[in-house]
């Protein structure tokens, strides 16, 4: 049993979404609070007739509670270990782990894994973590420990990249850095294609892992097509299109660093292939000035 002074009581009728297992409580649904609630605190949620509903992290804003559990259970280390282990086992069951052609996958996807406010991407031994709520950030010690216990020797480093993802008004001062170990930039692999990962300076966790299936889908349609990859970042869609047999691929991004990485990634997979051109330009200016016709954009 979990005993907390912090308590939220909902308005009549506002518990319906909770009974449907919606993971958020909106501020407008709250009738009153009990206890000295601070952002990131664990809080118990009750219906208007004082029935226990859920426990979650309190935050200031329109989303007032991100629900962690609908059970009346302790939120301690064993809770975090169970959730993270379950997420890993599910990825293993669907074939994302232990593959010769793939060492990259999203290990934790927030609400999808009943861990709202937490994203963990795995790159060939490095877990890159982003906390999107103060409550999750305050649990980083337990989360680090649970990742290490779950992944064991598959894990060489854990990097926290939460400076830009936490609420800017929160009374904390997060800094990007390693929570465990250390690793240099290196080459990871997705569906047999290689790419440089820059979790220190790159966008998101270093690569848009959640677009894996869309990249693979593009590959199926790219044969003999002229392809334009706008806002290309490091070129993920570009080299999938090339493997799919595209006649030509143009990659456009305003970031010169992203374009450099896109060129490197294409060279890793298709050395000497002249079907690819990369442009460090503002996207809409490129479109205005380009006279090319494209089959896929």
Which residues does each PLM region occupy?
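Rossmann-like S-adenosyl-L-methionine
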Residues: 180-297
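Short hydrophobic-aromatic micro-motifs
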Residues: 45, 54, 127-130, 188, ...
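Non-catalytic substrate-recognition/targeting regions of SAM-dependent transferases
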Residues: 108-121, 140-208, 216
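Short, surface-exposed beta-strand-loop junctions and turns on beta-sheet-rich folds
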Residues: 60, 135-137, 203-204
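Secondary-structure transition/turn motif
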Residues: 70-72, 131-135, 214
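Cysteine-centered catalytic environments shared across enzyme families
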Residues: 77-102, 129-174
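Non-catalytic accessory regions of SAM-dependent methyltransferases
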Residues: 1-124, 269
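Short coil/turn connectors at secondary-structure junctions
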Residues: 41, 154-155, 224-225
């Amino acid at each position: 049993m979990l005993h907390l002074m912090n308590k939220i009581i909902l308005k009549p009728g506002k518990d319906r979404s909770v009974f449907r297992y919606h993971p958020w409580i909106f501020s407008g649904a709250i009738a009153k609070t009990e206890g000295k609630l601070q952002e990131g605190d664990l809080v118990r949620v009750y219906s208007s007739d004082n029935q226990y509903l859920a426990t979650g992290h309190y935050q200031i804003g329109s989303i007032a509670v991100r629900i962690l559990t609908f059970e009346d259970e302790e939120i301690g280390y064993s809770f975090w270990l169970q959730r993270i282990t379950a997420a890993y086992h599910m990825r293993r069951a669907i074939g994302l782990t232990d593959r010769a052609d793939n060492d990259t996958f999203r290990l934790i996807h927030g609400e999808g894994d009943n861990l709202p406010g937490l994203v963990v991407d795995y790159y060939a031994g490095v877990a890159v973590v982003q906390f999107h709520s103060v409550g999750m950030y305050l649990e980083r010690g337990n989360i680090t420990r649970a990742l290490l216990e779950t992944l064991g020797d598959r894990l060489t480093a854990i990097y926290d990249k939460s400076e830009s993802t936490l609420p800017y008004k929160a009374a904390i001062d997060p800094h990007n850095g390693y929570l465990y170990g250390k690793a240099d930039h290196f080459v990871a692999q997705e569906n047999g294609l290689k790419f440089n990962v820059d979790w220190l300076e790159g966008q998101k966790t270093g690569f848009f892992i959640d677009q894996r299936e869309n990249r693979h889908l593009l590959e199926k349609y790219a044969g003999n097509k002229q392809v334009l990859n706008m806002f290309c970042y490091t070129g993920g869609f570009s080299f999938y299109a090339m493997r799919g047999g595209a006649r030509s691929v143009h990659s456009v991004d305003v970031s010169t660093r992203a374009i450099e990485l896109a060129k490197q990634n294409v060279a890793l997979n298709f050395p000497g292939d002249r079907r690819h051109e990369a442009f460090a330009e503002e996207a809409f200016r490129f479109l205005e000035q380009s006279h090319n016709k494209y089959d896929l954009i």
